Amino acid sequence: MSMSTHMPTPTPSDTKKMPPKEKKNKDDRPYKCTFCDKAFHRLEHQTRHIRTHTGEKPHACTFPGCVKRFSRSDELTRHLRIHTNPSSRKRKNKNQNMMINPNATTATTTGPAGMAIPTSNLPPGSYAIPNTAIPFSIDRNGNHVYHQPYPVYFVPHANGYMQPMVQTQGVTVVPNTDQQQHQQQQQYHQQQQQYQFQERPQHQQQQQTNIGTNNHLQQNGSAVFSLPSSPTMASAQTPNSGTSSSSESIKLAPLSIPNNISRPQQQQQQQQQQQQIPKSESSTSLYSDGNKLFSRPNSTLHSLGSSPENNNASGPLSGVPTPSFSNLNDYFQQKSNSNNSRLFNASSSSLSSLSGKIRSSSSTNLAGLQRLTPLTSTTNNTNNTTTSNTNNNNMTKPSIIPKQPSSTSLNLEFYNGNNQQQQNYHTHKKSRPNSPSQTPIHLSSSRKSANNSFIISPNETPLQTPLQSPQLKPYQDQPPTNVNINVSAPSDTFIGTAVTEKLNNISSIAGNGTQLPPIRSVLSFTSLVDYPDPKQKNVAPPVVDTTNVARGETNGSNGNNSNAKPMSLTNLLS
C-alpha cells in the first residue's frame, strides 16, 4: 500500500505548464513586421512577409520565354516544375478539345503590345509559344528592361516539317508553300526557256545529238535544202497550222517529259514527238544522198550565203557523217525552172548576189534613171583582166561597170571622137520598158549587174547585134594634123559604121577590144570615084573637121571645098 502512495499522480498544474512553453516561444520571435503586428522566428520569413507589402518579386523564372516573377523562392521552384515536367494529361485534353470544336475555345495569348491574339484562328494541330520577354538590362530605378518579340507559331506541314507562322501587329501571316513552289517552278521553266533561246547557237547542236540520233537516220526523203525565204515543197503543198521550227520543237521536247518516267519511256516519247514534228519552214537542214540529217547550228548566219566553203567550216556533228553537197546544184536547177529566177547564187559567199537581185527586180523605173545618167567605164582593157575574180566578194557599184574583155563575144561599144575624153558610153535599150527583167541567174556567174535590161555592151548580153544602126562617128589613131583625105585609097580613119552579122574578121575585133575593123575590110570602094573640083588639084589636102565628118561634110582649113558632094552612107553605097 505504501508503494501506491509514493507513486506521483498527474495534477492539473502539470498539465498547465505546457502552454507557458508555447507562450515562451511566441515571446522568442524577435523579427517583427514593420507594417503589421506579425513576428517571425527567422529573418528570411520576415523579409518574405515584407515583400508582400512592398510588391517586390526578385525571383524571376529562368525558363526561356517566361517572364513570371515571384517573391518567394519556393514559388519559383514550384513554377519551374511546370516547364520542366508538364502534365501530359492536360495537354491531351487540350488537343482533343481543339480537334473536336476548334472554334469553341476562345483562349487568347498576349501580343507584343499587350493585345490579345485569339488562338482559335490557328489551324488545327498547331500550338503557340506565348509572348515572353527576356530581360537584358536594368534601368536606374532597378526595373528590368525587356524585348517585345513577335510570337512565333509552328504549324505542322503535310511533308513532315514545321512551318513558322509569324504574327505581325495582330495579323497572322502563313506562307503558302504550294503557291510558292508553283511560282518557283514557273519561274525556273521561264528562265530555262529564255536561257535556251539566248544560247541557241551553242546548245542546238548538243541537243540534236542527244535527242534520238537513230530516229534522224531512219528518216527518208529526197535532197532538200530549206531556206527561210523559200520553204520546202512539202511544206508549201500541205501547209500545217501546227508547224513550228525544228530548233524550238527539239528544245521544248525535254521540258514536257516528267521526271518520274523511266529512261526507255522517255526515249519512246521523244521519238513520238519527233515523228509528229513536220518539216519546218525555217530549218537549214540538208538531206544528203545517204539519208542522213545534217542540221545547221546557226540558221541566220548561213541563210544569205550558201557556198559549200561556209557550210564545211562548221564541222560535222558527232555521230553524223559529213553530207555531200552534190545535191545543191539540183536544188538551184529546180528553183530556176519553177520560178524563172533564183534568189541566191551558189558560187557567191557574200551579199553581192542578194543586193544585185534586189536592185534588178525591185522596180522598173530604176532602169530608166540609169539611161539619163550614162555609165562610165574604164578605158584600159589590160588592167581589167582580173575583174571577174577580184570582184567576186565585193559589192557591185550601180553607177560604174568595169569592162570585161572577152575573146568569144563582140564588143559593140563606140567611142567618142574627142582626144581629151576617151570614155565609153553604153547605149541602153529595153524592148519592153515597163516589164520587169526575168533574166535567169547562172551558177557560173560571179556577180550581179545593176540592170538586167537589154544592153548593147557584150558584158551582159554576148553575141547580140543592136536593133538599130549606130551613129557614125570618126575615130583617129593619130593627131589630126597628119590626117589627109584620100578617097581613091581609103584610109584607116573612117571606122564605126554599121556592124552586121556579115562581119568577116571577128577575131581582129575581139583582139582590138572596142575598136572596130577598118571600113575597107567590110565595103569595097574600088567603084567609088571622088569628084574633086579641078581648082583643088594642086591644093594641099585639108584637115578633117571632126565635128562634121559624121554628117558626111568635109571643110578644109581654107574653106574652098564647099562645092564637094556630101559624103554620106547612101552616096558611098550607090
UniProtKB/Swiss-Prot annotation:
Residue ranges, compositional bias (Polar residues): 209-240, 277-288, 296-335, 433-470, 564-574
Low complexity: bias regions: 97-119, 179-208, 265-276, 336-363, 376-396
Subcellular location: Nucleus
GO terms for cellular component: cytoplasm; nucleus
ZnF C2H2-type: positions: 31-53, 59-83
Keyword set includes Zinc-finger: yes
Predominant location category: nucleus
GO molecular function: RNA polymerase II cis-regulatory region sequence-specific DNA binding; zinc ion binding
Keyword Flavoprotein recorded: no
GO biological process: one example: carbon catabolite repression of transcription from RNA polymerase II promoter by glucose
SMART domains linked to this entry: ZnF_C2H2
Keywords: Carbohydrate metabolism, DNA-binding, Metal-binding, Nucleus, Repeat, Repressor, Transcription, Transcription regulation, Zinc, Zinc-finger
Protein's recorded name: Regulatory protein MIG1
Phylogenetic placement of the source organism: Eukaryota, Fungi, Dikarya, Ascomycota, Saccharomycotina
